[in-house]
Amino acid sequence: MKKHLKIIPICFLSALLFNTAKAQAPKKDTINVGTVVGLMRDSAHNYVMQSATMAIYKQHSNDLVSYQLTNNFGRYQFKDIPVGIPLYVVATHVGYQSIKKEFLISPKTKSIDLKTLNMERIDLSLKEVVIKGQQAPMQMHGDTLEFNASAFKLDTNAVVGDLLRALPGITVWADGVITVNGKKINQLLVEGKPFFGGDNKIALDNLPKNSVQKVQVYQDKNDPDPINPKTNMNIVLKKDKKDGLFGKFGFGYGSLDHYAGDGMLTYFSPKTQVSVVGAFNNVNKIAGNVDELMRFNSFKGDGINDDYHSDFRRTGTNIFRGGGATFSQDFSKDADPRQSYYKTNQLRGEVFSSDLDNKTLTQSQTVVSLGDNSHLNQTSDDTQHSNDFSLRSNGTYQKRTEHAEINADYSVNNSQSISQATQNSTSLNDQNQDQSRNFAQQMATRNATDASGSFGINTNRYNNWGTQKNRSINAEFKYTFNLTHSNEDSKNITNFTATDTTQDKHFNRQYVKNIDGGTHTFVTNFKDITGLFQRRGNKFLQIDINNTISLHHENENDKVGDLAPGATTYTPNRDLTNVSHYKTIDDKVGVFLSKNFWKTLDNRYSKSWRVYVNLQGQIFDQKNEAQQTFQNIKRSYSYFIPAADFTYRNDQYGEFSKNYSLGYYTSVTYPTISQLAPLVDNSNVYSITIGNKGLKPAYKHIAYANYTYYDQKNKNPLNYKIELSANLVKNNIADSSNYDDLGRSVHRFINTSDSRSADYNGWLEKAFNFKDHQLQFSTNSGYSYSEYTTNVNGRDYLTRANSLRANASVFYTYKSIWQARVGENFDGSKSNQIGLSRFTNYNWATNLGLGFALPRSVFFSTRVDLNNNKTSSADHNIYYTIWNADVGYRFLKGAEGEIKFSLLDILHQNKSLQNYITANSLTTTTANVLQQYFMVTLAYYPRHFGLHKKKE
């Protein structure tokens, strides 16, 4: 079995390389092209030479014409090779002398057989022609596929992303995902290490092509999933380009006093990575961490994707200020990057601060169905001003050896928020015309500190071949914690009036809330217990024993007071003032049984099967002690929550990879204190939630089936995935609502009859490569159907809900000069409460994009989004268009300077329109948004690579 595991990566990459070779240089005119065939052999033993690199060049210019690898039988066949001109072929293989053979294809025969070429080992005298300094475009190095960057000529300002797009069989998709002949790259590494957190875009858009020595593709031998091992890509830099400095400093000013500034300075070396970033603007460019700002400030960061354009979907007017730094330090000794898994010894940290000021004006309209053709028509006008500040730091440490792994991480976030809000609401019953109004004001300040972290140790059993005894054990030990502390002071002023004046209510209520809580989780997993009693291999079931226990506590202190009319001091509210201590214990114990099977044939196929069953039980205890005695609750539950899965993988090297999986698992949702016995605040006049101590846990059954296909046949990959699932929930927890004629509602959670749902998700992507052109087609879609029971005004209604989302896009690129995109997006939902209500809502969006960038010169990009919205409560569709455009010029050496003119929301049509559907209501909300402005931006991109140059 272990032998099979070692063979699989080698077979896979050999086949991958062979097919990469078939994705050759650009096709020629079929009238003036021919074929070249031949055979490669080892001169000493007369073996056929597998995976030898064959490259054809023009004699007069040494331009590369085409290249490929020999197959399992040492043969090669070139098609579409120009006829009637002098050519030569260069053959290379690791451990052998390179050889050269000159030839010319006759225009009459349009084919030539080069017969047998013999390759000699490096330590033998050379009888054929030796080619010194001639590098093959690609080759096999052990089980690693290598591309030589110098064999591919690109613009002097090209970056790694441009290089990868020029490599045969490699596709860089529009979202940054990389595939090699359809196989998704799990990690893009630089010098065997993640590059600034592992975001592909940072390496693709910043590292220059001329700093790259080679690109390696290999399977992760140590992937814990033997059925579906992951594939990595490693960028090897030239010896004199191992370190570098890059960044951006930019500022823009535009109409209506709009402004935007951002900066980044990044340094990397073989052991150290450091980046400092910052941004400030009032044009809805908001980032949540250092990685986002690094991605937005990339050297080739602009295009038609609108990664760092204004977010016109964000509501309100926003002023953002943020900045931070990230660093990583590698303490491991220098080693082959392909073996870096066992050499990992890395520390990484980040600190990030953000300050966001938001002012939002919102209008909403809600239609609530009450049955018997009765409806509530509710409107609301809201004004909110908030300021949110946060300071977050986090760090990770990882160390791996051949038989053990240590992981540790932490995160601390301090946040402060100040908010003020006013709300004017009305409710009208269309049957009896009863009407009510509510005016509410809220002022709140909140300070919170959240901390989390984990520490884990994994050990691997290995065999001492001298004593034939097992050493160590396969085990996982992990501890995680989440802690929170918050203080909140707030005041609510409410004035409720109605046509029936006896129902008028007035509140001036003050709240002081303090919360301290935390969760501590301990994971213990002993793997492959049966292997402890066997010396060689494991011929029986693999048995794992696992236990996960979580201890949660939350202490809450609420002080609530009311200010009576004419009074000057707040009187304590005895119903809402409370001290509570909530604790839960969640313990899951299981026995995990699994069995793997393999069937392989070198360079042909690999088939694998895996079956597992997880026999797991769960014990859940909850206890709440409170000053309000009705909240004193103590409950214990125990459930059997099994899971099972069958996975089959079929890799036909050079053809396809298929993955099938079928499975079933269970889970339990337990009632919370806020559902069982909440504190009822009657100042929330329009919506009050009361408790239900009879609420039972909901038990969920989930069955699923997945199918994934990856094409490995040619340079035009087709990949797709289909996911199906079905859910059945026993004792489903649902909302029970009671409305009065004034629009006031009382909500209560209840257990209803079984709920059912079914879901579909899928995606497909196809790429076409021809010469310097690439066309990408991608689509993904999802559908969800559910049936459940709700209760409105004491009557049960069967509710059927549907939702559908679908999008498709076509993305075209020509070299790194032209880009174009056309896309369609649909998102719709429907809710049908049998005998009560029917609501529908959908959004259509069409987006068009075009961009070009002349080398070291002018660039232009534009994007148009056409939006169409329709709801069942509106008489007409709502249409609006967002059109943005940029034109700019790159100057200075290395295109390090930039001036850009941006036109945003050119048609001045941007709107914020959102729809929410519940079982018996439909809400449409509009808000103020950022609209048309123009801006001029200046930017400088410092770029220096090879700060401490070493000789090759």
Which stretches of residues belong to each language-model region?
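Short, acidic Ser/Thr/Gly-rich low-complexity loop/linker segments typical of extracellular
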Residues: 60-75
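Short Pro-Gly-centered beta-turn/loop motif in secreted/extracellular proteins
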Residues: 49, 77-85
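Short, acidic, small-residue-rich periplasmic hinge/interaction motif at the N-terminus
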Residues: 41-44, 53-57, 90-94, 112-153, ...
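Periplasmic plug
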Residues: 177-221, 234-237, 272
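Extracellular beta-sheet/turn segments enriched in Thr/Pro/Gly and aliphatic residues
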Residues: 24-30, 105-133, 232-236, 935
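A short, solvent-exposed loop/turn motif at the edges and junctions
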Residues: 58-63, 85-102
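Structural motif
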Residues: 31, 37-49
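Primarily recognizes Gram-negative and organellar outer-membrane beta-barrels
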Residues: 70, 198-201, 219-259, 272-952
